[in-house]
Amino acid sequence: MSKKVENLMLGSWLTALTAMLGSLYFSEIRMYEPCTLCWYQRIIMYPLVLILFIGYLKRDVNVALYSLWFSLIGMFTSLYHYSIQKLPFLTDAAPACGRVPCTGQYINWFGFVTIPFLAFTAFVIIFICSLLIIREK
């Protein structure tokens, strides 16, 4: 395995780990209760931490195929979630999805950075790294 692929695998894992720790920080320390769509994004992100870590330790570039699909699904989920938070015509029509509304914004840094935006960014990084790993092998 080339150093470039090794670094991409490590970067993917660190991105997933940071996203997982960030979501746990928001829910367990800041006491933000996750909405249903947040839970879906967690369900997609958390296994990536383990999958990418094992792939990195075993030097198995084939995990990039799994992380590619997980991250693609996560990108669509978080993009939809971000859209119903930020686009007025979607916000008004957003269905109730549990005790916490999916349109709620616990954070809104710089007027556009919300938790689903952070998740989307992490999924995009993992997706790009996975694509690059697949192209290198």
UniProtKB/Swiss-Prot annotation:
The keyword Transmembrane applies. GO terms for cellular component: plasma membrane. It is a multi-pass membrane protein. The chain crosses the membrane at residues 6-25, 40-59, 66-83, 111-133. GO terms for molecular function: protein-disulfide reductase activity. GO terms for biological process: protein folding. It is found in: Cell membrane. Disulfide bonds join C35-C38, C97-C102. It comes from the Bacteria. It holds the Pfam family DsbB. Keywords: Cell membrane, Chaperone, Disulfide bond, Electron transport, Membrane, Oxidoreductase, Redox-active center, Transmembrane, Transmembrane helix, Transport. NCBIfam families: PRK03113.1. Required for disulfide bond formation in some proteins. Belongs to the DsbB family. BdbC subfamily. This is Probable disulfide formation protein C. The gene is bdbC.
